[in-house]
């Protein structure tokens, strides 16, 4: 479950920001996790909630945005939806696809408190 290590990295980003910006805790953390990022959202949420106690994330509401997968087909030169890696182009059936969207994994923003 690599989501646990991803959660650790996210916590490190938050803790570093808390030290740098002098805030005590995060009340809302918004993450963008694309459909093609290879991340199981439920597992990531579980991992973040498991490591949050005693940190700046303790009690934070976690919000996720999940951008749809999208790819450029090199065979038919079209942008097509892509539900999962390894799928064929919905236009021509080719497998020569270059993902162009839905691969994101990033902290979008956070609402913080100084208390």
Curated annotation (Swiss-Prot):
Q: Which Gene3D superfamilies match?
A: 3.30.2320.80
Task: Kindly list the positions annotated as binding Ni(2+).
Answer: 2
Question: Which GO molecular-function terms appear in the entry?
Answer: nickel cation binding; zinc ion binding
UniProt entry tagged with the keyword Ligase: no
Tell me which InterPro entries the record gives: Hydgase_Ni_incorp_HypA/HybF_CS, HypA/HybF
Instruction: Enumerate the residues binding Zn(2+).
Output: 73, 76, 89, 92
Q: Which UniProt keywords apply?
A: Metal-binding, Nickel, Zinc
Give the Pfam families listed for this entry: HypA
GO BP term, pick one: protein modification process
Listed PANTHER family:
HYDROGENASE MATURATION FACTOR HYPA
Q: Main role?
A: Involved in the maturation of [NiFe] hydrogenases. Required for nickel insertion into the metal center of the hydrogenase.
Family to which the UniProt record says this protein belongs: Belongs to the HypA/HybF family.
Q: What is this protein called?
A: Hydrogenase maturation factor HypA
What is the species listed in this Swiss-Prot or TrEMBL entry? Polaromonas naphthalenivorans (strain CJ2)
Q: Gene of origin?
A: hypA
């Amino acid at each position: 479950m690599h989501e646990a290590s991803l959660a650790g990295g996210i916590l490190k980003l938050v803790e570093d920001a808390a030290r740098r910006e002098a805030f005590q805790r995060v009340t809302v953390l918004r993450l963008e996790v694309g459909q093609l990022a290879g991340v199981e959202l439920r597992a990531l949420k579980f991992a973040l909630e498991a490591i949050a106690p005693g940190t700046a994330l303790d009690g934070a509401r976690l919000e996720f945005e999940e951008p749809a997968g999208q790819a450029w087909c090199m065979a038919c030169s079209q942008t097509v939806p892509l539900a999962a890696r390894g799928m064929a182009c919905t236009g021509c059936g080719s497998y020569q696809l270059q993902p162009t969207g839905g691969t994101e994994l990033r902290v979008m923003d956070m609402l913080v408190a100084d208390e």
